[in-house]
Amino acid sequence: ERRRGSGTYISSESRRTPRGNSIAIVTTYISDYIFPTIIRGIEETLTNAGYDLTLNVTNNHVEEEARILQSLISRRVDGVIVEGTKTAFPNPNVELYRRLEKMGVPVVFFNSYYRDLPDSVYVVTDDRKAGLQAVDLLIEKGCRRIGGVFKSDDMQGHGRYAGFSEGLIHNGCVLGDDNVVWYTTAERSRLFRPDNSDYMFERLRGCDGIVCYNDQIAYGVIDLLQKHNVRVPEDVLVIGFDDSSISEYSPVKITSFVHPKVEMGRAAANKLIHMLRSSDPEQPLVLDMPLHEKESTRR
Protein backbone atom coordinates (compact mmCIF):
# COMPACT_ATOMS: atom_id res chain seq x y z
CA GLU A 1 0.00 0.00 0.00
CA ARG A 2 1.22 3.54 -0.79
CA ARG A 3 -0.15 6.75 0.62
CA ARG A 4 0.76 10.07 -0.97
CA GLY A 5 2.35 12.49 1.44
CA SER A 6 2.77 10.02 4.26
CA GLY A 7 6.01 8.36 3.22
CA THR A 8 6.42 4.98 1.63
CA TYR A 9 6.16 1.54 3.07
CA ILE A 10 5.57 -2.02 1.96
CA SER A 11 2.42 -3.42 3.51
CA SER A 12 2.09 -6.94 4.82
CA GLU A 13 -0.18 -7.72 1.87
CA SER A 14 2.33 -6.68 -0.80
CA ARG A 15 5.58 -7.72 0.81
CA ARG A 16 6.77 -11.05 -0.49
CA THR A 17 8.23 -13.70 1.77
CA PRO A 18 11.91 -12.81 2.25
CA ARG A 19 14.25 -15.02 0.28
CA GLY A 20 17.39 -13.81 1.97
CA ASN A 21 19.41 -10.70 2.69
CA SER A 22 20.36 -9.70 -0.83
CA ILE A 23 20.68 -5.92 -1.33
CA ALA A 24 21.65 -4.29 -4.62
CA ILE A 25 23.40 -0.93 -4.75
CA VAL A 26 23.02 0.90 -8.06
CA THR A 27 25.21 3.97 -8.52
CA THR A 28 26.27 6.18 -11.41
CA TYR A 29 29.97 5.94 -10.57
CA ILE A 30 32.07 4.17 -7.98
CA SER A 31 35.78 4.77 -8.37
CA ASP A 32 36.25 8.53 -8.27
CA TYR A 33 35.23 11.86 -6.77
CA ILE A 34 32.80 11.60 -3.81
CA PHE A 35 31.23 8.29 -4.78
CA PRO A 36 33.54 5.85 -2.94
CA THR A 37 32.84 7.62 0.35
CA ILE A 38 29.06 7.50 -0.10
CA ILE A 39 29.24 3.82 -1.03
CA ARG A 40 31.38 3.12 2.03
CA GLY A 41 28.67 4.57 4.28
CA ILE A 42 26.09 2.30 2.64
CA GLU A 43 28.28 -0.80 2.72
CA GLU A 44 29.34 -0.46 6.35
CA THR A 45 25.78 0.00 7.57
CA LEU A 46 24.28 -2.87 5.58
CA THR A 47 27.15 -5.27 6.24
CA ASN A 48 26.97 -4.61 9.98
CA ALA A 49 23.25 -5.39 9.81
CA GLY A 50 23.94 -8.75 8.18
CA TYR A 51 23.03 -8.06 4.56
CA ASP A 52 24.82 -9.30 1.44
CA LEU A 53 25.58 -6.63 -1.15
CA THR A 54 26.04 -6.43 -4.89
CA LEU A 55 27.32 -3.27 -6.55
CA ASN A 56 26.11 -2.12 -9.97
CA VAL A 57 27.34 0.90 -11.96
CA THR A 58 25.31 2.73 -14.64
CA ASN A 59 27.92 5.35 -15.66
CA ASN A 60 24.87 7.65 -15.84
CA HIS A 61 23.51 5.80 -18.90
CA VAL A 62 19.80 5.02 -18.95
CA GLU A 63 20.28 1.90 -21.08
CA GLU A 64 22.71 0.48 -18.54
CA GLU A 65 20.30 1.35 -15.75
CA ALA A 66 17.58 -0.58 -17.60
CA ARG A 67 19.81 -3.63 -18.00
CA ILE A 68 20.69 -3.60 -14.30
CA LEU A 69 17.08 -3.19 -13.16
CA GLN A 70 15.92 -6.03 -15.40
CA SER A 71 18.61 -8.23 -13.89
CA LEU A 72 17.57 -7.28 -10.35
CA ILE A 73 13.94 -8.09 -11.14
CA SER A 74 14.86 -11.52 -12.48
CA ARG A 75 17.15 -12.19 -9.50
CA ARG A 76 14.44 -11.07 -7.07
CA VAL A 77 16.69 -9.10 -4.76
CA ASP A 78 15.32 -8.11 -1.36
CA GLY A 79 16.04 -4.37 -1.51
CA VAL A 80 17.66 -1.74 -3.72
CA ILE A 81 19.55 1.50 -3.00
CA VAL A 82 19.84 3.64 -6.13
CA GLU A 83 21.47 6.79 -7.34
CA GLY A 84 19.25 7.78 -10.26
CA THR A 85 20.52 8.28 -13.80
CA LYS A 86 20.03 11.63 -15.56
CA THR A 87 17.42 12.52 -12.96
CA ALA A 88 16.63 15.94 -14.42
CA PHE A 89 15.11 14.27 -17.49
CA PRO A 90 12.03 12.06 -17.87
CA ASN A 91 13.24 8.54 -17.21
CA PRO A 92 12.28 5.65 -19.51
CA ASN A 93 12.98 3.14 -16.74
CA VAL A 94 10.28 4.31 -14.33
CA GLU A 95 8.12 1.28 -15.14
CA LEU A 96 10.95 -1.02 -14.04
CA TYR A 97 10.98 0.71 -10.66
CA ARG A 98 7.22 0.27 -10.47
CA ARG A 99 7.68 -3.44 -11.16
CA LEU A 100 10.04 -3.67 -8.21
CA GLU A 101 7.44 -1.93 -6.08
CA LYS A 102 4.73 -4.37 -7.17
CA MET A 103 7.07 -7.22 -6.24
CA GLY A 104 7.32 -5.78 -2.73
CA VAL A 105 10.97 -4.78 -3.13
CA PRO A 106 11.73 -1.56 -1.22
CA VAL A 107 13.82 1.05 -3.05
CA VAL A 108 15.70 4.00 -1.53
CA PHE A 109 17.25 6.71 -3.70
CA PHE A 110 20.30 8.75 -2.76
CA ASN A 111 21.74 11.99 -4.18
CA SER A 112 18.67 12.38 -6.42
CA TYR A 113 15.41 10.71 -7.35
CA TYR A 114 12.80 10.64 -10.12
CA ARG A 115 9.93 13.11 -10.02
CA ASP A 116 7.88 10.57 -11.98
CA LEU A 117 8.00 8.47 -8.78
CA PRO A 118 6.61 11.15 -6.44
CA ASP A 119 6.26 8.94 -3.37
CA SER A 120 9.86 7.75 -3.45
CA VAL A 121 11.96 7.44 -0.33
CA TYR A 122 15.20 9.34 -0.84
CA VAL A 123 18.18 10.97 0.85
CA VAL A 124 19.35 14.11 -0.94
CA THR A 125 21.14 17.39 -0.27
CA ASP A 126 19.43 20.78 -0.10
CA ASP A 127 20.90 21.99 -3.38
CA ARG A 128 18.62 24.98 -3.79
CA LYS A 129 19.52 26.31 -0.35
CA ALA A 130 23.24 25.90 -1.02
CA GLY A 131 22.95 27.61 -4.41
CA LEU A 132 21.25 30.56 -2.74
CA GLN A 133 23.90 30.70 -0.02
CA ALA A 134 26.64 30.66 -2.67
CA VAL A 135 25.26 33.80 -4.29
CA ASP A 136 24.70 35.49 -0.92
CA LEU A 137 28.36 34.90 -0.03
CA LEU A 138 29.57 36.35 -3.33
CA ILE A 139 27.32 39.39 -2.88
CA GLU A 140 28.69 39.90 0.64
CA LYS A 141 32.21 39.82 -0.84
CA GLY A 142 31.31 42.59 -3.28
CA CYS A 143 30.52 40.62 -6.43
CA ARG A 144 27.87 42.05 -8.75
CA ARG A 145 28.23 40.17 -12.04
CA ILE A 146 27.95 36.52 -11.10
CA GLY A 147 28.14 33.67 -13.58
CA GLY A 148 27.65 29.95 -13.24
CA VAL A 149 28.40 26.53 -14.70
CA PHE A 150 25.71 23.92 -14.06
CA LYS A 151 24.96 20.32 -15.01
CA SER A 152 21.76 19.98 -17.01
CA ASP A 153 20.98 16.26 -16.84
CA ASP A 154 21.04 15.69 -13.07
CA MET A 155 18.55 17.03 -10.54
CA GLN A 156 21.30 18.52 -8.37
CA GLY A 157 22.31 20.89 -11.17
CA HIS A 158 18.79 22.23 -11.48
CA GLY A 159 18.47 22.64 -7.73
CA ARG A 160 21.74 24.54 -7.47
CA TYR A 161 20.78 26.75 -10.40
CA ALA A 162 17.37 27.42 -8.84
CA GLY A 163 19.05 28.72 -5.69
CA PHE A 164 21.61 30.63 -7.76
CA SER A 165 18.94 32.42 -9.80
CA GLU A 166 16.82 33.11 -6.71
CA GLY A 167 19.84 34.65 -5.00
CA LEU A 168 20.61 36.94 -7.91
CA ILE A 169 17.04 38.18 -8.20
CA HIS A 170 16.67 38.61 -4.43
CA ASN A 171 19.84 40.71 -4.33
CA GLY A 172 18.87 42.86 -7.31
CA CYS A 173 21.55 41.48 -9.62
CA VAL A 174 21.19 40.70 -13.30
CA LEU A 175 20.63 37.06 -14.18
CA GLY A 176 22.56 36.99 -17.45
CA ASP A 177 22.02 33.95 -19.66
CA ASP A 178 25.28 34.69 -21.47
CA ASN A 179 27.21 34.10 -18.23
CA VAL A 180 25.58 30.75 -17.42
CA VAL A 181 27.00 27.60 -19.01
CA TRP A 182 25.06 24.33 -19.03
CA TYR A 183 26.62 20.94 -19.76
CA THR A 184 25.66 17.27 -19.72
CA THR A 185 27.49 14.24 -18.36
CA ALA A 186 28.81 13.46 -21.85
CA GLU A 187 30.05 17.01 -22.36
CA ARG A 188 32.00 17.45 -19.12
CA SER A 189 35.29 16.15 -20.48
CA ARG A 190 35.12 18.63 -23.36
CA LEU A 191 34.37 21.77 -21.34
CA PHE A 192 37.97 22.77 -20.70
CA ARG A 193 39.73 21.22 -23.67
CA PRO A 194 42.02 23.63 -25.55
CA ASP A 195 39.65 23.75 -28.53
CA ASN A 196 36.81 24.87 -26.24
CA SER A 197 38.68 27.14 -23.83
CA ASP A 198 38.09 30.37 -25.75
CA TYR A 199 34.33 29.71 -25.82
CA MET A 200 34.24 28.99 -22.09
CA PHE A 201 36.30 32.05 -21.28
CA GLU A 202 34.08 34.31 -23.38
CA ARG A 203 30.99 33.02 -21.60
CA LEU A 204 32.50 33.83 -18.20
CA ARG A 205 34.45 36.96 -19.18
CA GLY A 206 33.65 39.96 -17.02
CA CYS A 207 32.22 37.97 -14.13
CA ASP A 208 33.58 38.82 -10.69
CA GLY A 209 32.05 35.71 -9.12
CA ILE A 210 31.36 32.22 -10.50
CA VAL A 211 29.26 29.43 -8.96
CA CYS A 212 30.28 25.98 -10.21
CA TYR A 213 28.22 22.78 -10.16
CA ASN A 214 30.93 20.90 -8.27
CA ASP A 215 34.61 21.00 -7.35
CA GLN A 216 35.65 19.34 -10.60
CA ILE A 217 34.12 22.21 -12.54
CA ALA A 218 35.49 24.81 -10.14
CA TYR A 219 38.99 23.37 -10.62
CA GLY A 220 38.59 23.65 -14.39
CA VAL A 221 37.27 27.21 -14.16
CA ILE A 222 40.17 28.34 -11.97
CA ASP A 223 42.68 26.77 -14.37
CA LEU A 224 40.93 28.41 -17.33
CA LEU A 225 40.95 31.84 -15.70
CA GLN A 226 44.60 31.58 -14.72
CA LYS A 227 45.57 30.66 -18.29
CA HIS A 228 43.89 33.90 -19.39
CA ASN A 229 45.76 35.88 -16.71
CA VAL A 230 42.70 36.31 -14.51
CA ARG A 231 43.53 35.87 -10.83
CA VAL A 232 41.51 33.91 -8.28
CA PRO A 233 40.49 35.29 -5.80
CA GLU A 234 41.91 38.76 -6.53
CA ASP A 235 39.90 39.29 -9.74
CA VAL A 236 37.23 36.59 -9.59
CA LEU A 237 35.77 34.57 -6.71
CA VAL A 238 34.92 30.91 -7.37
CA ILE A 239 32.68 28.53 -5.39
CA GLY A 240 32.22 24.78 -5.84
CA PHE A 241 30.12 22.04 -4.30
CA ASP A 242 30.92 18.77 -2.49
CA ASP A 243 34.13 19.76 -0.61
CA SER A 244 35.95 16.88 -2.29
CA SER A 245 39.69 16.24 -2.21
CA ILE A 246 39.91 18.27 -5.44
CA SER A 247 39.04 21.40 -3.46
CA GLU A 248 42.19 20.89 -1.38
CA TYR A 249 44.75 20.07 -4.05
CA SER A 250 43.59 22.77 -6.47
CA PRO A 251 46.30 25.45 -6.97
CA VAL A 252 43.84 27.78 -5.27
CA LYS A 253 41.98 25.87 -2.57
CA ILE A 254 38.30 25.94 -3.46
CA THR A 255 35.54 27.28 -1.23
CA SER A 256 32.92 24.55 -1.36
CA PHE A 257 29.70 23.31 0.18
CA VAL A 258 30.32 20.12 2.14
CA HIS A 259 28.55 17.05 0.80
CA PRO A 260 27.51 14.80 3.74
CA LYS A 261 28.91 11.75 1.98
CA VAL A 262 29.14 9.15 4.74
CA GLU A 263 26.00 10.47 6.46
CA MET A 264 24.05 10.17 3.22
CA GLY A 265 25.20 6.59 2.66
CA ARG A 266 24.36 5.55 6.20
CA ALA A 267 20.98 7.27 6.14
CA ALA A 268 19.99 5.60 2.86
CA ALA A 269 21.03 2.19 4.22
CA ASN A 270 19.15 2.70 7.49
CA LYS A 271 16.00 3.71 5.63
CA LEU A 272 16.16 0.55 3.54
CA ILE A 273 16.68 -1.59 6.64
CA HIS A 274 13.64 0.06 8.23
CA MET A 275 11.54 -0.64 5.13
CA LEU A 276 12.66 -4.28 5.11
CA ARG A 277 11.90 -4.86 8.78
CA SER A 278 8.85 -2.70 9.41
CA SER A 279 5.56 -1.81 7.76
CA ASP A 280 5.67 1.70 9.22
CA PRO A 281 6.02 4.47 6.60
CA GLU A 282 9.48 5.79 5.81
CA GLN A 283 10.10 9.46 5.02
CA PRO A 284 12.49 11.23 2.63
CA LEU A 285 15.45 13.09 4.13
CA VAL A 286 17.03 16.35 2.92
CA LEU A 287 20.52 17.09 4.28
CA ASP A 288 22.15 20.49 4.60
CA MET A 289 25.46 21.31 2.93
CA PRO A 290 27.52 23.57 5.24
CA LEU A 291 29.95 26.00 3.65
CA HIS A 292 33.70 25.40 3.93
CA GLU A 293 35.38 28.66 2.95
CA LYS A 294 38.90 28.47 1.55
CA GLU A 295 41.18 30.53 -0.65
CA SER A 296 38.99 30.93 -3.74
CA THR A 297 36.65 33.42 -2.02
CA ARG A 298 39.02 35.11 0.42
CA ARG A 299 39.91 38.72 -0.27
Where on the chain are the PLM-derived regions?
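Alpha-helical recognition/docking segments in bacterial nutrient-uptake
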Residues: S11, R15-D136, E202-R205
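An alpha-beta-alpha
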Residues: L132-C173, Q283-R298
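Short beta-strand elements in bilobed, periplasmic/extracellular small-molecule ligand-binding domains
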Residues: T47-V57, G148, S165-P194
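Hydrophobic alpha-helical segments within soluble ligand-binding/sensing domains
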Residues: D116-G148, E166, R190-D198, A218, ...
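Short, solvent-exposed amphipathic alpha-helices that sit
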Residues: Y33-N48, A130-Q133, M155-L175, G220, ...
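N-terminal helix-turn-helix DNA-binding module of bacterial transcription factors
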Residues: E1-R19, R298
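Flexible loop/turn connectors
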Residues: S197-R299
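Short acidic capping loops at alpha-helix termini that bridge into adjacent secondary structure
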Residues: R145, L175-N179, V232-L237
